[in-house]
Amino acid sequence: MKFIIKLFPEITIKSQSVRLRFIKILTGNIRNVLKHYDETLAVVRHWDNIEVRAKDENQRLAIRDALTRIPGIHHILEVEDVPFTDMHDIFEKALAQYREQLEGKTFCVRVKRRGKHEFSSIEVERYVGGGLNQHIESARVKLTNPDVTVHLEVEDDRLLLIKGRYEGIGGFPIGTQEDVLSLISGGFDSGVSSYMLMRRGCRVHYCFFNLGGAAHEIGVRQVAHYLWNRFGSSHRVRFVAINFEPVVGEILEKVDDGQMGVVLKRMMVRAASKVAERYGVQALVTGEALGQVSSQTLTNLRLIDNVSDTLILRPLISYDKEHIINLARQIGTEDFARTMPEYCGVISKSPTVKAIKAKIEAEEENFDFSILDKVVEEANNVDIREIAQQTQQEVVEVETVSGFGPNDVILDIRSVDEQDDKPLKVEGVDVVSLPFYKLSTKFGDLDQSKTWLLWCERGVMSRLQALYLREQGFENVKVYRP
């Protein structure tokens, strides 16, 4: 099988040296992502495209899907590469490829040509289009908005029959810009802002401030791992978790009610800046949107920024909530965000929307900054690739089974779309569907006399959810890995 990778247009307008660097980085990223599917595949870069050739036909759909999620790719073409002798030979090969698709449809032919030939692209379009129109009685030519566009590419003595075109996510290849640290909470905003910086070519590390126990951290780990695995797995990134409960306790005890929200955000920026400096990261990323909550007014945002010299990027600053939720739905983080455990330990009864710098600084004089230094020093830093392994260690008390007993039921916790695409059927045992984002509210409604074997494709989500359910007191939970 063969895929032609078309570059994001902004890459093609760069200077020659920058363009070559971007293409080289994108080629490496593609290799890093696809080696998990087929170690023998070949990735070859050219000036205006990248070729991917693989032998394992069983991995075709997986490879195609992975390519559409790699930043820097505008679209991909799935092609059949064949030799040709003349223009009539091109027509015959196009007829064999497209006959069934064109029956009863309107169509047009579009040709791109590279190399020296005795014919032009327009001449090929007319010849092939006329031939298809004559040989397929139910088809007719329509040059504007046809049902089917027959895409052909002629390169020297090779004909590329384009079997399908699939849109990528665009943007710049990860690694072409510098690293950033995303302050991730697991909600709609931080997930979308992290994705937007990945799409713009940044390697995104994650910093999580734990305000409320293990359940919240488990949920945020799921989001971070999902984002990395789906859009950024070409690079290693860090997941840094900071236990912020001591800081929250100090704020509740020492800070005036109306100033708590701004002070908490300033403490988070201070802590994140220390982490960024430790690992040589150039900027922080937050999901703040102007006016969304009391701490996100211009006055308050300026005061929050003042505590650090580190650049703070806010890609969602002008977005409304509906737009953010729509983006979360597109990238697949909406279900995580809707069911994310929330912690409301620092909510002022009357938060200020226009904090005064002198007053904020006076409140912070009462704060014991050694507490902040201590929690940063004790921060848990893991390679995001190890989250699955670490989760496996943490849920060692949750048994992993490959078979099943008479009282066991397999619980498929994949999303509804994944279940529809690839239904799970296991002979000799019942399979019940309950998407992971409904477990926290619906698992208790299931028959608790049964033993539930949680299953997902890779096993990461099932282990995380098993740990969560165990913490909620459910002992009838195991992880199913056939």
Curated annotation (Swiss-Prot):
InterPro entries: Rhodanese-like_dom, Rhodanese-like_dom_sf, Rossmann-like_a/b/a_fold, ThiI_AANH, ThiI_fer, ThiI_N, THII_Thiazole_biosynth_dom, THUMP_dom. The keyword ATP-binding applies. It comes from the Bacteria. One of its GO terms (cellular component) is cytosol. It is found in: Cytoplasm. Pathway: Cofactor biosynthesis; thiamine diphosphate biosynthesis. Signal peptide: none annotated. Disulfide bonds join 344-456. Keywords: ATP-binding, Cytoplasm, Disulfide bond, Nucleotide-binding, Redox-active center, RNA-binding, Thiamine biosynthesis, Transferase, tRNA-binding. It holds the Pfam family ThiI_fer. It catalyses: [ThiI sulfur-carrier protein]-S-sulfanyl-L-cysteine + a uridine in tRNA + 2 reduced [2Fe-2S]-[ferredoxin] + ATP + H(+) = [ThiI sulfur-carrier protein]-L-cysteine + a 4-thiouridine in tRNA + 2 oxidized [2Fe-2S]-[ferredoxin] + AMP + diphosphate; [ThiS sulfur-carrier protein]-C-terminal Gly-Gly-AMP + S-sulfanyl-L-cysteinyl-[cysteine desulfurase] + AH2 = [ThiS sulfur-carrier protein]-C-terminal-Gly-aminoethanethioate + L-cysteinyl-[cysteine desulfurase] + A + AMP + 2 H(+). One of its GO terms (biological process) is thiamine biosynthetic process. Its main location: cytoplasm. One of its GO terms (molecular function) is CCA tRNA nucleotidyltransferase activity. It is an enzyme of class 2 (transferase). ATP binds at residues 183-184, 265, 287, 296. HAMAP family: ThiI (MF_00021). Catalyzes the ATP-dependent transfer of a sulfur to tRNA to produce 4-thiouridine in position 8 of tRNAs, which functions as a near-UV photosensor. Also catalyzes the transfer of sulfur to the sulfur carrier protein ThiS, forming ThiS-thiocarboxylate. This is a step in the synthesis of thiazole, in the thiamine biosynthesis pathway. The sulfur is donated as persulfide by IscS. Belongs to the ThiI family. This is tRNA sulfurtransferase. It comes from Salmonella dublin (strain CT_02021853).
